[in-house]
């Protein structure tokens, strides 16, 4: 497995744009949060917290506890801090942090991460850091893209990178995401000494309100593709992906565009 972290290091994230186009991820995180059964005094860590909205929702569930949200994008951390200021969220902190270099020791009752860890190349480093950071009776609850996630739209995007107009920009391009199977992730947990309570692939239907909304999502999350291009060409590239995708997967009777996603849900303890 390659070393280091890919999330947010070379990509210029637009936190405000991400907030606008991440409602499916937020809803899927809420589905998990409803199962957490928090008592209200726990200490939490949210890895790759992004724009901070899920972290803030978790803060409200632990009024007598606290939560730290970390992200390796300075723009995301700044956005989250401004959107959820300490004056209104006294038990919530946002910090810059590298998911592969967690420097916490026996501090957290719960470590979470939502819709982010598929950007990280070295999951053994992430899981080792989580293990160090958990209290003896702590647990980790993680959700991110799993094997088969966004397969069709990724195939479409990769095919378009071979077209004459674009192929010169994608010499040496490597697929940027890491989508694992249940068996692979079970193996990672065992290697770092965490006990798997649940590792499950869950299909999800991401629904976009038309082709323009699909393009907004592509602009937000397909940064490994678009940021290889001159800025003046990015919108054309995104539009070409969206058009090719709806040819392969037509809009439904309401004009919505469906993208089949797969989440890997993980719960583990010491």
PLM features: what roles do these ranges have?
Residues 43-47, 51-101:
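Class I SAM-dependent methyltransferase SAM/SAH-binding core
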Residues 110-123:
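A short SAM/SAH-binding and catalytic strip from SAM-dependent methyltransferases
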Residues 2-42, 53-57, 76-79:
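Conserved class I S-adenosyl-L-methionine
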Residues 100-111:
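A short acidic, Gly/Pro-enriched loop at the edge of an enzyme's catalytic core
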Residues 196-253:
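C-terminal helical/coil "lid" or tail adjacent to the Rossmann-like core of SAM-dependent
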Residues 216, 263-270:
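Core SAM-dependent methyltransferase catalytic element
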Residues 124-139:
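A short glycine-rich, Lys/Arg-flanked "PGG" loop and its adjoining helix->strand segment in the class I
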Residues 139-209:
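Conserved catalytic/acceptor-binding region of the Class I
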